[in-house]
Amino acid sequence: MTVIAPPPQVVLPVMQHIGAPCKPLVEVGDYVKMGQKIADNPAPVSAPIHATVSGKVIAIEPRPHPLGDMVPAIVIENDFQDTPCTDLAPLTPEQMKDPEAILERIREAGIVGHGGAMFPTAFKIRGGLGKVDTLIINGAECEPYLNGDHLTMKNHPEELLKGIELARIASGLDKAYYGIEKNKQDAIDLLLSKNPAQYGVEIVPENVKYPQGAEKMQIKAITNREVKPGGLPSGVGCNVISTQTAYAIYRACYEGMPSIERVLTVAGSAMGDKSYNLQCRFGTPFSYIVEQCGGFVVEPKKIVLGGPMMGLIATNLEAPNIKGTAGILFFTDKEDRSVENPTCIHCGKCLTVCPMKLEPLYMYKYFQNRDFENMQKYHILDCFECGSCSYNCPGRLPLTHTFKTAKLLFAARAAEEKARAEAAAKEAETK
């Protein structure tokens, strides 16, 4: 793993989580310290943003977001001093036994799910209190190319276990389960050597299969419970957090360090089929990250954020990495599987590989007809976009992409219906 120096400028979008966007707490011209809170929102589902370098705020303006669109961002000119902000002191031993103190620290440190979903961790744990009896830490890391979790386990085993212990205490539980695929035996052995039982943690070696790292698959593997269509993990008494989220909890509580960096993987044929694992500050533009890896061997045709199966397409190299960026993959024609006229040949492979036992070929058909009633009937909203159907489709149908689009359409329809209902209610009030 390589720690890369932060860039001359960091670009910090105010939206790095699911929920309410943050609002800037600083103005252009302000000097900020590394770790200083620079944006926040009091809404329950939100997480503050912190300066990842010290320096001067030179802009607060729309900038490219890694997930698309232009999003308000705070731009800081790095003074290369890393002058620390000391607002978050390490928790005392007494506070580390207090669930409320831990939850408040997780929230103030801006910690969100590092597995990609970016759900605010404090809200997730708090929402499970009284409902959840099982805390699972996801160490499967089943996506090809990605190695950040594996390296975190090897480099910080004891810190990880302490972070899991804190999450367990905050959840009001006596035990947590750390699910790790058996292809990471070196990390499993290292964690076992640290006596995880003293932290209330049980290491659970898991079979190596995709998509073992999906939240619902982790729950099934460890508890044999199944999340029903439309249900949530808390509905079966479970909460799942990622490896790097647990490490971020450790740093926030033991070091007083808010969430300002993570380990990510850079790889792909455009990088000469080399893989780089970098500890990188949030707000670092992709172009700078590529430079630190020696540049492209070939110009990429596709940029993927995350893994090749469940990752999202990015289009702008000036977009920065954010809290949920587990990897950046740069692909050329070598990996391009698209065809001009994809055709379903009714082979049924998509039915056999779907871990949720959905029927992708029918979901795809009903999407083509914009048949929302039947899309819902066939549980299209329960697809967690693992990509298994697309990968195995001999007709090269863009199944996973289609289902992602369908979810956006459902969300848009719901927003329209809500707006119409609110407008009708206002109209009724004026009569």
Name each region found by the language model:
Residues 64-119, 129:
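Acidic low-complexity segments
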Residues 33-46, 61, 72-78:
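Short hydrophobic beta/alpha edge segments that flank linear recognition/processing sites
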Residues 1-25:
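N-terminal, Lys/Arg-enriched amphipathic/low-complexity engagement segments
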Residues 83-85, 113, 135-149:
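Gly-rich Lys/Arg/Thr-decorated short loops/hinges at beta-loop-alpha junctions or inter-strand turns
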Residues 55-57:
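Conserved hydrophobic positions within beta-strands
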